[in-house]
Amino acid sequence: SRGLGDVYKRQPKNRWEMADMVRFAVDFPYPVALRYPRGEAYEGLKEFRTPILYGKSEVISRESGIAILFIGHMSGLGESVWKAIKEAGYHCSLINARFAKPLDTELIRDLCRDHELIVTIEENVLAGGFGEQVVQYVMQTGEKTRVRTIGISDDYVEHGNVEVLRKEVGLDQETIVAQIKKDYLMIKED
């Protein structure tokens, strides 16, 4: 979520970006919150290690049609969903949002120009989260791009195996890919 007042929230995509974000935070003049999961850090996307710029996302792949924006350790899931969507024949961009706050409004405005659907993936409660912030921004700009937020509803989640729990709340590749295809088909029918 983004509700920490004047604290700037960042979430690294993998262990290399975690080290880069810690270095960035040391020199940053304002309070910074760095969210990372317990357990192992994602080992993928190592070749994508662009410099961290304040409030700016990292564009991993840029096309048109569908844009997937993941934040933090949802990088592995975001990458697998992106690959599955591409293999199904869709044009799709993949974006590492990096910052939950501040939102990279310049990039989102740019994505709205050539994407009909923006999908946000976060392992946070949707209410007050990153995806909700994207929805609000797109609505304020008057853009016609649709936004699908994928995350956790504001319900109690039992303690347990992380992969099982993610599947239960819809944070798995199969569920997300099916939702994206359904949403995109509805857009094309309009």
Regions found by a protein language model. Give the residues of each.
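Flexible, glycine/proline-enriched loop segments at strand-loop-helix junctions
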Residues: K9-P12, R166
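Conserved glycine-bearing catalytic or ligand-binding loops at nucleotide- and phosphate-handling centers
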Residues: Q11-V26
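Active-site core segments that coordinate phosphate-bearing ligands/cofactors
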Residues: K9, R23, K46-F48
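Thiamine diphosphate
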Residues: D27-D190
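Short, small-residue-biased leader/transition segments that mark boundaries at the very start
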Residues: S1-Y8
